[in-house]
């Protein structure tokens, strides 16, 4: 079974070798879905981070400054993941390695 699967995967590139337009279309769809999922995940993560910081500040107001600093660092790291997804989407759209 593994040999058949390997053969199908290996020969798929020959079957779709001349379909440059189809690869471009799928690249646009993949970039849109990938960036949408990354933005959704980033927004959910940022919401949880802000909620946890507000909860921590409400429980201990003396740590508000430290929690705020930590929150901004966490938000920057979350946003960096979304920016990485944007870079990958732009590479898939404008410098597509599958088009040759």
Curated annotation (Swiss-Prot):
Gene3D superfamilies assigned: F1F0 ATP synthase subunit C
Keywords: ATP synthesis, Cell inner membrane, Cell membrane, CF(0), Hydrogen ion transport, Ion transport, Lipid-binding, Membrane, Transmembrane, Transmembrane helix, Transport
Cellular compartments annotated: Cell inner membrane
Superkingdom as given in the UniProt entry: Bacteria
HAMAP family per the UniProt record, alphabetical: ATP_synth_c_bact
Assembly and binders: F-type ATPases have 2 components, F(1) - the catalytic core - and F(0) - the membrane proton channel. F(1) has five subunits: alpha(3), beta(3), gamma(1), delta(1), epsilon(1). F(0) has three main subunits: a(1), b(2) and c(10-14). The alpha and beta chains form an alternating ring which encloses part of the gamma chain. F(1) is attached to F(0) by a central stalk formed by the gamma and epsilon chains, while a peripheral stalk is formed by the delta and b chains.
Protein name, as recorded: ATP synthase subunit c
TM regions (residue ranges): 26-46, 71-91
MF terms in GO: lipid binding; proton-transporting ATP synthase activity, rotational mechanism
Site (Reversibly protonated during proton transport) location in chain: 79
Its membrane topology: Multi-pass membrane protein
Family: Belongs to the ATPase C chain family.
Organism: Campylobacter fetus subsp. fetus (strain 82-40)
Annotated GO CC locations: plasma membrane; proton-transporting ATP synthase complex; proton-transporting two-sector ATPase complex, proton-transporting domain
Protein's job: F(1)F(0) ATP synthase produces ATP from ADP in the presence of a proton or sodium gradient. F-type ATPases consist of two structural domains, F(1) containing the extramembraneous catalytic core and F(0) containing the membrane proton channel, linked together by a central stalk and a peripheral stalk. During catalysis, ATP synthesis in the catalytic domain of F(1) is coupled via a rotary mechanism of the central stalk subunits to proton translocation. Key component of the F(0) channel; it plays a direct role in translocation across the membrane. A homomeric c-ring of between 10-14 subunits forms the central stalk rotor element with the F(1) delta and epsilon subunits.
SS bond partners: none
